[in-house]
Swiss-Prot record:
Disulfide bonds: none annotated. HAMAP family: QueA. This is S-adenosylmethionine:tRNA ribosyltransferase-isomerase. Pathway: tRNA modification; tRNA-queuosine biosynthesis. Its main location: cytoplasm. Its EC number is 2.4.99.17. GO terms for cellular component: cytoplasm. It comes from Methylococcus capsulatus (strain ATCC 33009 / NCIMB 11132 / Bath).
Amino acid sequence: MLKSEFHYDLPQNLIAQSPLPERSASRLLCLDGATGALEDKSFRDIEKLLRPGDLLVFNDTRVLPARLFGRKETGGAVEILLERLLGERLMLAHVRASKAPRPGTWLALEAEHRVRVVERDGDLFLLELAGEEPLQTVLEQIGHMPLPPYITRPDTSADLERYQTVYATRPGAVAAPTAGLHFDTELLGRLRGAGIDMARVTLHVGAGTFQPVRTENLEDHRMHAEYCEVGPEVVKAVERARGRGGRVVAVGTTSMRSLETAASGGSLRTFSGETRLFIKPGFRFNCVDALVTNFHLPESTLLVLVCAFAGHRETLAAYRHAIAQAYRFFSYGDAMFVTPNEPAANR
């Protein structure tokens, strides 16, 4: 399929610039991929959409304050966006400046911290932090929350809490797994009380999640690599849900990609390593039965994923409905509850 087949026009005023006062107060558009039927609901209605014995799978990655500001030796301003931690003082990062810094040069950061440009690797730079403090500590001191590029306001202290899920425990992401932002502790407690099981995978979301498909033909697109982990407790939880007739509900595209990476052989197994899984129409789903997800950018790999799961025509019709009904889009926006166009292969 072609990238242009996943385009839609979105009014700029529908791009949410800030979160709602309450996490679970968002709207929820339900899409039945088998029929194309749509229902407008509140996110709190997810309690009624889930059944006892269902399994919610969350991504427990924690977003690092991964945006740094500084200056080159010549005085020019630079902006650094961490892509991945490679060690206590090494990172792979995007560097935005009027002119790309050369290997061997130093970049001055806030609070008298400095990083040295070690080498360039395509669009990314290998940077080394000077001194003895671990990079993660320095990020916590002077880093800014890496809000997506379509959020045009400066980050604030409120984003340190709201651009983070309430269950985030494993630092490493530079973008939030945004479907999880709608769950607050009260809602999670009610779901547990209703007999909904829960499990956690880890996928450290990279900045590449915001990159568009760069080739017209989807088959030619190469996905960015992200670290993910599916532990034995997740495998057991899925087996338990299957045994009780429950569904595996992925909270977010990152949870779905983690599960389907680990189930690529046909059945779910433990997994730890990099994934470049690009889920597109024609993909054989082996694990996930339903998906909670936000609305995604036109021509993005994430929109392609939802189309693969719920159907291309059905998904784009749902997006047109969401626009007509003034849903809020993207990271701080509203959500969808999606059931598949076809059931998972192993059901």
